[in-house]
Structures are given as structure tokens and as C-alpha cells.
């Protein structure tokens, strides 16, 4: 079975994670795909495959004769899809011999324009996979799951030489919980790759340092007819707080290594208002500056409106994996060779986000990220191609081969 065929099957299983649940996994529906994968893994020869109580799927392929002393390599992908767009009743559509032009998604009439998505022109002649426009596709990261299992099936069927291969599929990556209960000792790998990136040929070993902040503003309500010099409108103070942050440090005004403050949520009335932010920067010192800046703004507003008017709660989320990858840079060098062997040019760009691998790297499992061949994640214009998924699978096989020598 080719990787895209697996993706078409997995995409139809509803696995959107739930950021509000507070449970592990965040949604019981994630077990539906987990059980399907365990069954499939056993059918291709991964005899010890199982899913644990928190919806982590694990399985191992023992080393072939003569490769027992080679390092144990891990491959990891996540099963959940992002809650940013609908993920139920996904209807994948194959556009064979795609002409490189605008694509109309029939479920909504939405048009994926090449002027908006210039990369589409580069996909001309390939078999493009989209949805009907009513849901996301789930290529993030069911394409990674599909590519790992297709590579595993190839290794077993063709009896290719390899060291121990450790496979894991995680829940809740999209809500930042994918690595929280990952069993690194039980997984058994010396190092690993997550297969959760964008276009095929990508290698990601730098990511944001991340934090979140909740700003709570306590107002004082007075009848508006007699409010002069008495009312403190929490919603107005919230707007004042937000406008004190730099306009040019927002997601929509930054790129590359530029960090940002992102206002994700806001609500309020006269009595109370709340602002929810995520803070991101590749440089840990610059992230600390952003955290300090929020506190300084709160201090200023408390001086203006009274102590306790503004409260800021900051939580660290994940850290840049680069520091933990540098001592194991063979992972990057091997990935480069594997990509070149597949006839592609490696592309190494900083991740403007995070991966399970970033958290796992800091927990002791060095884990850069590889491209899957997908585009436009987290939205209804998400897409991939048959050919790029095949290439991603080939790259995984090349990595396994290189570590077996």
C-alpha cells in the first residue's frame, strides 16, 4: 500500500483534539485511529504494537541479523488534527495530473488561488490531494503516520537490513500535549525523528521558545450616568494593555527568526476582561524580554488605575530544540544525505512553531523534524500530493539504510 492510500483512510477518522478537556487524551475519538493503527501495524508484522491508556501507540521492528548493535532509531508522528478547522466527515479529493492552476473546492466553492498560494504552481503534473473545502485534510500529521507505516511495511516485506526501529504515534500534539506523557524509556530509541513538517525535503531542528500569558483585568462598575472619575472599564483597560504591545511584533508582521506576541482570545465587560496570548521567539533571551514587557505594562497600568487592576499569569510551554540537537548533529547530517539520495535538495529553515520533537529533545530524546510533503496545515485549504508523500517515504527508508551501515 502506498502512503497516500493510507492517508485517504486515516483522514476519514475524526481525531480533532480538544484544548478545553483537560484529559489525556483530550478526546476519546482519538482512540478510533489508534486502534486502527495497532491492527494495521500487527498485520504488516509489527507484532508488539499496542495502544496505552493515554492513547499513545508504540511498536518495534527488531534489528535484522548483523545490525543488532546499530543504534535504535525512532520515528514519530501524531494522530490528532488541529481544532482550528472542522475535522469531521473529511472528504479527500484527488486531482490527477494537476495543471498548476487555481483549484475550486466543490463543497464550498472556495477557490485556492495560485496568487494566494504560489507553491501550487510547483505541483503541476502531480496528483494533488485536497478536501472538498468543508474541513481540513489532516495531512498534518496523518501523512506522517502514513509515511512511517509505509516505510515500515517496505522494510519488512523486502527484508531490508536495519537496526532496531521504534515507532510511536501520539495524541494531542496540536494542543501542545503530544509529548507530555510519552514513555521515552519504554520507546527504546537512542534518537528519533518526528515526521510532522511541511514540504518534502525539509529538515527542522530549530523551533520557537514558547510561553503563554493570561492577562486578567479587574474593573469597577458604576452607573454610566455618574461614572466620571469613578468607573474603571475593564474592557477599555484591556484594549490599552494590548495597544501597548508593538504592532510590528505580531504573527502577521513577522517571519523567519522574528518573534511575536499573539492575541489568541479576548473577552470582557466593565467588571472584568481577559486577554490570552502566546509568546514566541527562537532566542530565549528575547522571549524573556517579551515576558518581562507584559509585566512592565501591567505594572504601569496598576500605577494608573490602582494596585491589582491588572494581573498577568505566564506559563512556559516548550523550548528551542537546537541546543539539544547540536551534540547529536549526525541526525541532521544523515537527513541531508537521505534527502539528497532521494534526488532533492535539503531545506533547513527555523520552525515558526513547535513539535513533539522539541519537547522530547529536552526530555532526553534528540528529535529533529522531517517534511511530509504537505501544505496549508490547520485550514480547509490543506493539501499534499501523492508524489511528495512517496518521496517522504523514500527519505525515511534512506535514513534507516544509512543508520544500518
Residues of each region from the PLM?
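Short beta-strand segments
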Residues: 74-78, 168-170, 193-196, 216, ...
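Metal-dependent amide/peptide-bond hydrolase catalytic core
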Residues: 235-405
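Midchain, well-structured core segments that form catalytic/ion-binding scaffolds
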Residues: 111, 117-120, 126-139, 172-299, ...
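Active-site metal-coordination/substrate-binding segment of hydrolases
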Residues: 67-161, 169, 189
